[in-house]
Amino acid sequence: MNGRGPVGPPRSGPVRSPATRRAGGDPLIRLFHVSKSYGPGSVALRDLSVEVRKGELVFLSGPSGAGKTTLMKLLFAAERPTEGQILVLGRNVARLGERRIPALRRRIGVVFQDFKLIQTRSIEENVALALQVLGRPPREVRSKAFAMLRRVGLQHRRHELPAALSGGEQQRVALARALVNEPAILLADEPTGNLDAELTIEIMDLVAAAAARGTTVLVATHDQALIRRYARRTLRLAGGRLLEDIPGGSI
């Protein structure tokens, strides 16, 4: 079903799956006819309209080059759309001034496939950094960093450097860092791409638990077995276009 969006003169509103319509509250993410081009003959996204509500766990599926990573970058303002409008937490990302981008990113947690941990800092320091940049008091930083590491089962290794941990453990640290300031949105770009099957489930269970606590989660993955296992709403992309918006339980 297509509705009309609240901004601009869109030709039709964002795609809403049945699962989305049942969700409570207003959408935290809304895209209206979004396209992203890197030059002639290099179009990453084409006329994408979709919305995601609070507490949804949504998979972004598609082959390499489908536009999954580009969409993630647009949502946390690492890039700007060539056309269209993007509302994230009520803010028009396409028009957001550079000075206001940090405030938006403080409410968005991001997990990358390659972890992006600071190798010269301890596990606890990596997680604490997300709170320190917000100016939180040292006592609160230590308490919340420890509590989050305990949630992912790594509090006993908090003083070690990332290189001492396995790939799965480093990904858990990256997830703890992304969630420690209780973001409204979590973006996970191929978070299990380098992990074996057992560790993949371990990480995805933590991601699903974040959604159950009310965080809106988008997970980019090409792992169809993972999508079938969790049976959540799935946006299938190909060639930068949205081919299907499949409600949870339909795969």
Map each language-model feature to its residues.
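Helix-to-loop junction immediately C-terminal to a conserved catalytic motif
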Residues: 76
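Short coil-to-helix segment of the ABC ATPase nucleotide-binding domain corresponding to the Q-loop/switch region
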Residues: 121-129
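Conserved catalytic motifs of ABC-family nucleotide-binding domains
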Residues: 182
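Catalytic Walker B motif of ABC-type/P-loop ATPase nucleotide-binding domains
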Residues: 186-189
